[in-house]
Amino acid sequence: MSEMPTPVNFTEAAASKVSGLIQDEGNPELKLRVYITGGGCSGFQYGFTFDESQAEDDTVVEKDGVKLMIDPMSFQYLMGAKIDYLEDLQGARFVIENPNASTTCGCGSSFGV
């Protein structure tokens, strides 16, 4: 388990939204897992899920008491990324600004390296 500072920026807005969702679920053991899968129009897709269990090799980023976990395979693609939550005219959503992505699709949910 790695809990050292990491080059992933988990914003206060994202942590606050996750905290509210965890409260809605009524399970304080939940943590947000961010992961990468193959697929999407650009080759890779971002995924978000709640998880109670933390693997030994997960990288953990904590912000305001909320834990974000990233598995080692996904972490290599997310180094330097900013994980944020936005509410604007396009709606409310989690957004990943990833400097490793050489291409992204129009909706921002998939990318290529």
Curated annotation (Swiss-Prot):
Free-text remark on how the cofactor is bound: Binds 1 iron-sulfur cluster per subunit.
Q: Which cofactors is this protein said to need? A: iron-sulfur cluster
Ligand binding (iron-sulfur cluster): C41, C105, C107
Q: Name one GO molecular function term.
A: 4 iron, 4 sulfur cluster binding
Q: Which domain of life is it from?
A: Bacteria
- Keyword Iron applies: yes
Q: Which terms in the GO cellular component ontology are assigned? A: cytosol
Q: List UniProt keywords, sorted A-Z.
A: Iron, Iron-sulfur, Metal-binding
Matching SUPFAM superfamilies: HesB-like domain
Please give the biological process terms from Gene Ontology that the record holds.
Answer: iron-sulfur cluster assembly
The record's comment on protein family reads:
Belongs to the HesB/IscA family.
Stated role: Required for insertion of 4Fe-4S clusters for at least IspG.
Q: How does it assemble?
A: Homodimer.
This protein is called what? Iron-sulfur cluster insertion protein ErpA
